């Protein structure tokens, strides 16, 4: 990927933040809005809220997302593609992109709970430390996203579920979308949080998540692509976007799994980040263009959509898992 390597290329953002912090609110108020969501049109949202949870790794590179200038470069390349409908980001990244004028005509989803830091001793106590519903309304955002990891063996799960339900209600009161990303999760033998990606586990997490809050009128699901995806999508009537997660396997395998899943009823599109922002070959524009070409192009589903994170067939005794997003 060919990028501008001038270390001062974003120095103006620091200057604006120092001298004119109200510029963020003005940029949000004056930006051109997305024309709106329509049934039958799948949407493409780029996700960039991982650093706020201390999750900087991509594949084997533990600090891949550490350089903010590099990340902003990659995000601007992705957002420049007219097929990309919007952004999902933490407040710091969202504000940078607003100041850069990169969000004109885009959907905006804020990341609400980043308190469950990767590796934290009580990681399942995933507190709402990011965007609030009120802040998202003030930004003119379209909704908020919440990671909802459910660990049946951890008492902090109940507090996270309660906080998620309250956030869903707060968003719904403002007619904003609640994008809920549920997982059944466990700690492995080394104490690392991992998500259970068997279809039955994903289906159970969906059942729990879609029942949160006093209304589901504005609730969406954000789900992984796993083996037996038809059964997963049969478990909900809520609009659903597909997440990418930390890429493993070849890019061709990842894209093929997305294409199959995008053909299923109820799937509204993609909300992915690291797979496209940090592709194996470094070609961000190419990866984004390929992903965009999958939207609305898939024919009727004829078999299982097998995601790259699924690991073993559904009949295997081995539990396919992936580190949390």
Predicted regions and their residues:
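Anionic group-transfer/hydrolysis microenvironments
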Residues: 49-51, 183, 224, 275
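A generic structural signal for short coil/turn motifs at secondary-structure boundaries
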Residues: 55-56, 118-121, 153-157, 278-280
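Alpha/beta enzyme core
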Residues: 60-82, 94, 99, 113-116, ...
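Catalytic-face loop-and-helix region of soluble metabolic enzyme cores
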Residues: 224-300, 317-324
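Intrinsically disordered, low-complexity terminal tails and inter-domain linkers enriched
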Residues: 300-318
């Amino acid at each position: 990927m060919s990028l501008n390597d001038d270390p001062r290329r974003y120095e103006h953002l620091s200057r604006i933040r120092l001298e004119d912090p109200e510029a963020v609110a003005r940029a949000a108020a004056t930006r051109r809005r997305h024309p709106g969501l329509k049934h039958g049109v799948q949407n493409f949202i780029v996700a960039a809220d991982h650093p706020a949870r201390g999750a900087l790794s991509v594949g084997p590179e533990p600090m891949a997302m550490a350089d903010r200038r590099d990340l902003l470069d990659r995000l601007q390349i992705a957002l420049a593609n007219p097929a990309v409908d919007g952004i999902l980001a933490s407040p710091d990244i969202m504000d940078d992109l607003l100041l850069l004028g990169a969000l004109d005509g885009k959907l905006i989803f804020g990341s609400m709970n980043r308190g469950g830091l990767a590796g934290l001793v009580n990681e399942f106590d995933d507190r709402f430390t990011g965007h609030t519903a009120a802040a998202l309304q003030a930004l003119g955002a379209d909704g908020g996203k919440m990671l909802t990891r459910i660990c049946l063996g951890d008492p902090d799960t109940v507090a996270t579920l309660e906080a998620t339900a309250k956030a869903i209600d707060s968003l719904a009161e403002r007619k904003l979308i609640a994008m809920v990303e549920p997982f059944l999760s466990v700690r492995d033998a080394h104490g690392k949080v991992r998500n259970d990606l068997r279809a039955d586990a994903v289906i159970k997490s969906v059942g729990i998540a879609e029942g949160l809050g006093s209304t589901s009128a504005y609730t969406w699901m954000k789900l992984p692509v796993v083996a037996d995806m038809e059964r997963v999508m049969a478990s909900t009537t809520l609009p659903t976007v597909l997440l990418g997660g930390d890429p493993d396997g070849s890019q061709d395998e990842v894209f093929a799994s997305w294409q199959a899943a995008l053909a299923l009823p109820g799937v509204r599109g993609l909300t992915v980040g690291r797979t496209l922002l940090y592709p194996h070959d470094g070609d961000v524009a190419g990866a984004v263009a390929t992903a965009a070409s999958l939207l609305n192009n898939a024919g009727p589903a004829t078999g299982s959509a097998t995601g790259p994170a699924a690991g073993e067939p559904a009949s295997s005794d081995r539990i396919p898992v992936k580190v949390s997003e």
